[in-house]
Amino acid sequence: MAKQIQAIRGMNDILPTQSPIWQKLETVLRETVSAYGYSEIRTPIVESTDLFKRSIGEVTDIVEKEMYTFDDRNGDSLTLRPEGTASTVRAGNEHGLLYNQEQRLWYMGPMFRHERPQKGRYRQFHQFGVEVYGIPSADIDAEVLMLSAMLWEKLGITEHVTLELNTLGDSEERAAYRDALIAFLEQHKDVLDEDSQRRMYSNPLRVLDSKNAAVQALLADAPALMDYLGEETRSHFSHLCELLEAVGIQYTINPRLVRGLDYYNRTVFEWVTSSLGSQGTVLAGGRYDGLVGQLGGKSTPAVGFAMGLERIVLLLQTLELDKDIKPAVDVYVTAMGDSCRVEAIKVAQDLRASLPNLKVMSHCGGGNFKKQMKRADKSGAAVALVIGEDELANNQVAVKYLREDKAQELVARDALATYIAELV
C-alpha cells in the first residue's frame, strides 16, 4: 500500500463539517464592507521578496524568521505573501489607483508565515483586511473602527472584545522618542532579555511590546511616547477619540501598543479578547501614511486593518456561537423504488428553481427506505421528502420531519414549494 501523503505542518484542511461557520463569517464580512461602500481587490499570493523587505521592515520577525521565500527558475527571489497591506499598496501604485484619489478597498485570502503552529495560528492562514487611501483626517480612522465594531455586532461577539488605541506620532516625533528610549534601555541593558537586546537598536519600539515580565516592569519608568508628540498628532488622536465616543465605541488607551510592522504612524489599534488565552488579539491595524511613497508611489495617506479568520472562527467556537448556524442542507429528497427516481429528481429541481435560497439534496445510489432515511438524517436536513408509488400515483409528496416530533404529512405536488417555503 502506498504511503499516505499528509498536509504540511501548520497548513490545515477546512472540512465540510467546518465550512458552514467559515461561510457565515465570510458572508458577514462581505455584507459589512458592502454597507460601507468598500470595493474588493484581489492580489497574487506570490510577490517579489523586496516588496515585503521594504514595507514590513528587514529587522522585523516576519522578514527575519517567518517568510516563505524561494528563488524561481530565473533567479528572482519570491515570497508567499505574509500579509495583505503591502500587496494592496503595490497593486495601487502599479495601476494608478492611489495618487490624488480616495480608495476604500478590502481583501480576503490566504497568507503564509513560518511560525510555530498553535491553536488559532497556522502557517497558512486566511486574512481579511480593509485599506483606505487618500484621506488624512481622523474621521476615516474612526470609520474603519466603526466598520470593525459592526462586524463584532453582526457576529454576536461585541461583549467579548475590547478596543485598545495608541498613537505613534509622525516619523520625526518617533525618531526623537526612539533616541530617548535607546538611551534609557542602554542604562538598564542588564535587565533586558536576549530578544529585547537584539531589538534595542534595530527596532526599539518593539521592546515596548515585550512579553518578558522583568522588561515590562522596567518599562514603567521608561520615557513616554506621548511626551514627544506635537500638537498636530495630539489633535488628530484627540479627534479620533471624540468620534469614537460620539458613536458609542468604548476604548482603552494603551501606551505600550506599537504593532509589529515598521510602516505604522500615528493611530494604531487592536481589538483583543480574553476568551482565547494569551493570544488575545483578533484584529489590528492603524495608519501608514508613508508606505505608498516607500514603495515607489506618490505620498498618500492611508489607514487600514487586518484580521485572521482562523482566530475569529476559534472565538465563535469557544463562545459556542457556531451552534445556531444552519446546516448545509434544508431538504433531502428520497425515492422509494426505481419508478419514482425520475420524479424525485424533478421535485428537487423544481424546488431549487422556485426557492433559490433553499438547499436541496437528492438521494443518489439507490438503497432501501432505512438507508435513505439514515442518509437524510446525516445530511442535517430539517425534512425528508419521500416519493413512493402511492405518492407518484396521487401526485403528492410525503414530508417527513427529521428534527421535530411531528407526524408525516402528504402535500400536493403543485403546492409543495409554498409548503416548504413556510416550513424552512
From Swiss-Prot:
It comes from the Bacteria. Signal peptide: none annotated. It catalyses: tRNA(His) + L-histidine + ATP = L-histidyl-tRNA(His) + AMP + diphosphate + H(+). Gene3D superfamilies: Anticodon-binding domain (3.40.50.800), Bira Bifunctional Protein, Domain 2 (3.30.930.10). It is found in: Cytoplasm. GO terms for molecular function: ATP binding; histidine-tRNA ligase activity. Its main location: cytoplasm. The keyword Ligase applies. One of its GO terms (biological process) is histidyl-tRNA aminoacylation. InterPro entries: aa-tRNA-synth_II, aa-tRNA-synth_II/BPL/LPL, Anticodon-bd, Anticodon-bd_dom_sf, His-tRNA-ligase, HisRS-like_core, HisRS/HisZ, HisRS_anticodon. Belongs to the class-II aminoacyl-tRNA synthetase family. Homodimer. This is Histidine--tRNA ligase. The gene is hisS.
